[in-house]
């Protein structure tokens, strides 16, 4: 661990959590006010996703989404303090029976989720409750943030795996019975994904999860870590999602990816304030794609 990271984590730890939450919520509010570009992205995304909502409600959700992300940042260093004795103070887990049943199949487990609630604390809670997992992610541009995030995740035993060229390592991991968690709610380039419906609009989505499930036979489960009114989190592990297997690989991948995306949309609709609306989810357009 670099000296800069040691100092940074020490500063985070000595500042009371309540103060951190207040500070980062304030910074999030400033971000909403000062960054016109990102504010317009959020408001546009929300207006298209919820045409039935009033402008005032759209603005309320937008501001709450910023605050939610601020809390994720403020709470991140708390992961280093989580252990079997105190994790229940942060997270209550529902659906572990689905996960245990999936593990008993002996083909590894594929979890999928979104940048929703506090996915990082959810990953840590899963590692403590059962076993560490492999988290697929994109390496950050900032070397300091990259080191910090990788270190904090590893304190619970979780492994961060760069999504670039990750297919073979993931297949090997599943053969060893490992658990892999993939967030599939981000826009991808046209050559990296397929278009499926998301909030009524075509969204270019990674096909990697469906391809991996078809190749490995590993069970696929949704998981969401939602912030509750009391400030704690509810981690919900869903039942295994059936994978379409007709022999037409392209159609099977598209249909399964649509099912996964539909599950994510359904959960976001329940708690729209907790999703990352700042992201340009619909950036890639169908006109950029050649007919396949």
Where are these regions (language model features)?
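Membrane-anchoring hydrophobic helices of lipid-metabolizing enzymes
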Residues: 1-113, 146-149, 157
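Non-catalytic C-terminal accessory region of glycerolipid acyltransferases
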Residues: 34, 53-56, 60-63, 103, ...
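Residue-level recognition of alpha-helix initiation/capping sites
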Residues: 37, 93, 117, 143-144, ...
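Short, flexible loop segments at the rims of nucleotide/cofactor-binding pockets, characterized by
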Residues: 86-91, 138, 156-161, 199-200, ...
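Short amphipathic alpha-helical segments and helix-helix/interface helices
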Residues: 99-100, 123, 149-150, 171, ...
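Catalytic core of membrane glycerolipid acyltransferases/transacylases, capturing the structured
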Residues: 103-164, 187-194
């Amino acid at each position: 661990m670099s000296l800069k990271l040691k100092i940074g984590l020490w500063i985070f730890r000595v500042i009371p959590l309540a103060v951190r939450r207040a500070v980062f919520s304030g910074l999030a509010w400033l971000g909403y006010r000062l960054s016109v570009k990102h504010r317009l992205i959020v408001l546009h995304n929300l207006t298209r996703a919820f045409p039935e909502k009033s402008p005032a409600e759209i603005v309320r959700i937008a501001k709450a989404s910023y605050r939610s992300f601020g809390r994720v940042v403020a709470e991140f260093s708390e992961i280093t303090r989580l252990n079997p004795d105190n994790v229940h103070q942060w997270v209550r887990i529902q659906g572990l029976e689905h996960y245990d049943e999936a593990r008993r199949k002996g083909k590894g487990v594929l979890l999928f989720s979104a940048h929703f609630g506090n996915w990082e604390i959810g990953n840590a809670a899963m590692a403590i409750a059962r076993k560490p997992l492999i988290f697929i992610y994109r390496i950050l541009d900032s070397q300091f943030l990259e080191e910090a995030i990788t270190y904090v995740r590893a304190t619970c035993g979780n492994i961060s795996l760069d999504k670039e060229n990750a297919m073979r390592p993931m297949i090997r991991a599943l053969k060893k019975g490992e658990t892999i968690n993939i967030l599939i709610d981000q826009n991808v380039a046209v050559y990296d994904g397929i278009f499926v419906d998301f909030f009524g609009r075509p969204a270019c989505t990674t096909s990697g999860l469906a391809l991996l499930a078809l190749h490995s036979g590993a069970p696929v489960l949704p998981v969401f870590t939602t912030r509750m009114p009391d400030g704690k989190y509810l981690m919900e592990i869903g039942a295994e999602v059936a994978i379409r297997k007709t022999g037409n690989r392209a159609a099977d991948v598209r249909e399964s990816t649509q099912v996964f995306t539909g599950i994510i949309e359904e959960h976001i609709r329940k708690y729209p304030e907790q999703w990352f609306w700042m992201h340009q989810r619909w950036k890639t357009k169908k006109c950029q794609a050649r007919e396949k």
